[in-house]
Amino acid sequence: MKKNLVFLLMAFLTLNFVACSDDDDDDNDPVTIEGRGFNIDQTFNVTNKDNTAEVIVNIATEKGIENLIVKIESPVLTEDVLNAVNLPKEFDLANPASEELAQTLIGFGLLSKDKKIKGSTETTFDVSQFMPLLGGFENPGPHKFILTVKDSAGNNLSKILTVYFPNLKK
C-alpha cells in the first residue's frame, strides 16, 4: 500500500510539474512581430547596388489586431517631407484617422482595399517598395519604423524595424 501511495504521489508531482512548466516558449506569445527572413531585433542593412531589398514584417495575434501603430523616425523622412505626401509621422494602420489617410496608405501599398487589418489575426508590414526611395536620399540612416501591435485582449508588443544603407556616404 505504501508503495502504491508513493507511486501515486510521484505521478501527481510529475504531472503537476509538467502542467505548470514555466518555459519561455515563443510559440505561445499572444502577439508576434517578426522579420521575414531577417531578425527584426537587428539592423537590416540594404546592400544591393540599386538599393532594393525585401523588407517584410509578419505580424500575428491570437485574439485579433486592435491597433497597428507605425511611428517613423528617419533623418530624411522628416515631418515636413511626410506631410508633403499626406502621411503623418505616426499612424494606426488598423484604424486610419481619416478616409484621406486611408487612401494615402492604400496608395503607398501599406493598406489594401480588400483586406482589413483590424480584427484580423495576421498581416504584413511591407516597406520593400520604399527601399530605392530611401536609398535615393543618399543618407544611410538609420531609418526606423517603430511598430506597436495591440490585440483585442489588450496584449501589446513593440518592435523597431531599423533600416540602414551602409554603402551610402553621410
For each of these PLM feature ranges, what is it?
Residues 1-7:
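Bacterial N-terminal signal peptides that target proteins for export
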Residues 29-170:
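First exposed extracellular module after export/assembly in secreted or surface-exposed proteins
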Residues 5, 13-41:
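Bacterial Sec-dependent N-terminal signal peptides
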Residues 2, 23, 131-133:
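Short secondary-structure boundary micro-motifs
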